[in-house]
Amino acid sequence: MAKAKFERTKPHVNIGTIGHVDHGKTSLTAAITIVLAKTGGAQATAYDQIDAAPEEKERGITISTAHVEYETQNRHYAHVDCPGHADYVKNMITGAAQMDGAILVVSAADGPMPQTREHILLAKQVGVPAMVVFLNKIDMVDDPDLLELVEMEVRELLSKYGFPGDEIPIIKGSALQALEGKPEGEKAINELMDAVDSYIPQPVRATDKPFLMPIEDVFSISGRGTVVTGRVESGIIKVGEEIEIVGLKDTQKTTCTGVEMFRKLLDEGQAGDNVGILLRGTKREEVERGQVLAKPGSIKPHDKFEAEVYVLSKEEGGRHTPFTNDYRPQFYFRTTDVTGTIKLSADKQMVMPGDNATFTVELIKPIAMQEGLKFSIREGGRTVGAGVVTKINN
């Protein structure tokens, strides 16, 4: 069956369902597509199609993720749903599925459970900006007082982890009733999508952020100077603009005197472009892979940070043994490896393969970084973990 082509005229938002196992994340995902299909905003996707999520590799880690897309009156959404808890942990830490917002699914019959807490905490750690709650399975609860109690618990839990628990929209409904085509089931799905439309903020587009380009290669072109190449991560660079070279050494200022793409000269390079940038007065040996070009003052180099990390299991090709305090692997940021030392918190003796953990890292050289930056942990050239910078300590 040919895929319906979506008009890209509406603003795009990436979203995902999170929450405890068996609380109805996949049923809800299916219900959204089935309800929106009635107005032509989606291709109806059955539970089984979503549940049989294909495996993907992201930074050497295998993750099962299902992707569906749909649109409301106002927006176009790409929605991710994961079959297993471990897939969520990996997904959120590696940023395999970037989430601009999340739908937290909580079963009204059970209330918040351990993974509900863990997913809220992870969402906070990795910087998911906002979430909306779907209180599912209300057809299994007869007592309105119980519903109210569960709602209060969810709000308290959200507040505890730094989300605005009092403001977050909580929609009550039953994904099952929506799948069965019952009017009250469909009404709840429409209410949920209205809440997602209005409450999840529109993400800032990459081109509107400050200019940043990780340096992949450096050449010197006789008579013209030094050219650095890479893919522009964010923002726009125009010929004649002043830029900084950040990371590994002291920050240097320089000027962009040319932007080249596919051997053609351009006036500017923007997010997503693979470009060569000619730098005025910069010597070949002053720049290296692993540094970044950036808008002056927009990013600083740091060597100490806190991170949320997923450690690969033995089956995933990771370590066979746990690591302890003062473990010294390589940290791969953007385009280069830097050695660093891991400091575990006082209450943690070791980290087991297959676990996720929070710890502090001290690098031997500073890297241009901001909160939310993703990295891999490598040992002898193989990936043993993936992480995200949650806090910079300097």
UniProtKB/Swiss-Prot annotation:
Protein residues bound to Mg(2+): 26
Species this chain originates from: Rickettsia conorii (strain ATCC VR-613 / Malish 7)
UniProt GO molecular function: GTP binding; GTPase activity; guanosine tetraphosphate binding; translation elongation factor activity
Alphabetized SUPFAM superfamilies for the sequence: EF-Tu/eEF-1alpha/eIF2-gamma C-terminal domain, P-loop containing nucleoside triphosphate hydrolases, Translation proteins
Region: G3, residue numbers: 81-84
Protein name as catalogued: Elongation factor Tu
Top-rank EC class of the record's enzyme: hydrolase
Entries under InterPro entries matching the protein: EF-Tu_GTP-bd, EF-Tu_GTPase, EFTu-like_2, EFTU_2, G_TR_CS, P-loop_NTPase, Small_GTP-bd, T_Tr_GTP-bd_dom
EC number: 3.6.5.3
Keyword Transcription: no
Enzymatic reactions: GTP + H2O = GDP + phosphate + H(+)
Positions of the UniProt region annotated as G5: 174-176
